[in-house]
């Protein structure tokens, strides 16, 4: 009898342990060694940034709510940080990887990132935010799959491929940084790469991907480049757009897609053509001279080379604007949760604040700078979030140095200083990006997705709201603004933290075209924001200061 009771007790404890194990989301551990290495993206050997010896870096394959733990060892000769472009880090900007939220990983040291793609699915990527490292590599794909119990609005593909497209410079990241520090532009890129390579286009390239005839494939396309919008297309194949930066979209077929810097598209491609080789084509947009590269797709068992006749890309930005207007949120599909995306009626929420952000460029002390509303951001030695957390904000930066509706005089006179907006928690805000320049801009917001309700030519006025898409605009994290145009986005600032609003044009970001949105919880509650992790790095004015004891407490 005693043995039976003991067995029953053991079974009970085992069952309890099983419950505990399954109650917590899975953990996935990675160790990354960041080093310099040599590669030939454009056919000429040059220094690049490798992760575990790879260029591009490893793909992160995760599922909604997974705990992703990455121990990053910096073996470069410079400070280093990675950001996870599009991951929202709910209540946890401590892992965002921007200079305003984290101290850099110093040479010869390491830091362990721990983040969750909480209630997210979709196609993303990571890249370095320090200096001009992005121009040397250090980037890679990041996919977040739906949980098994959540229905997906398309059949399971045969395989899942990540296509990282971007412009490329033959000059090193240190040379490019010297140009910018000296007040010069880095100019136009030398080429385009697909997954770190530029195809010869003569049929001699090794295939990047292999397809089985008749099968469908998930193809995720991200523009990880420095500054250039890129059009992507596949010979003789249509791409069915199914997802965009974490949102399921209405499924339309496209011959080509304009992918602006920082953006990601999830497509379905069917191998329904004659079994042979086909070219993927990536070409620059909005440059006087078009730069093109190719990557090879090979049908399994296929015979015959790819045709040398490449499909032509579109011309002008009006075509691109029309394509943007064709993107629609799939209101009936479920994203990371069982409820349909369309159950959130953003168009019925009252706007509580309108912020207009006007991008400009000019010279300060004879050197090129880029600005928002007349302020060109500079990173203080003490990260903004640390200054805020340790209660020394007044020693590091001032809030709201720009106005929500800048005058022409304010825009014209550029000042260099930290640019931090104070945003009230849980307010529904309209942000208008106004582009008076001749180049296409690409804007990203960390910590959130927003509804891109309009992109139109001209100057924004309140009357333009009548043209907003208040029903099925796509919820995303990066939006383009065409020359002499404006873009409007809507969102609820419900994720506490210090969040970067930046130009995805690396040259512009480095020279000041960015700001931070500070969203603080009035209750200082753990329900709204996590305390600074014990493992967080400290630098600047708080380098040797003890961490505050649980400033965020309560439910």
Swiss-Prot record:
List where in the cell it is found.
Answer: Secreted
Q: Which residues form a coiled coil?
A: none
Q: What is its main location?
A: secreted
| Keyword Hydrolase recorded | no
Q: What are the residue boundaries of the Plastocyanin-like domain, all occurrences included?
A: 25-145, 158-301, 345-524
Please tell me which top-level EC class this enzyme sits in.
Answer: oxidoreductase
SUPFAM superfamilies listed in its UniProt record: Cupredoxins (SSF49503)
Please give the function described in this protein's UniProt entry: Probable oxidase that may be involved in pollen tube growth.
State the similarity comment.
Belongs to the multicopper oxidase family.
This protein is called: L-ascorbate oxidase homolog
Organism listed in the record: Brassica napus (Rape)
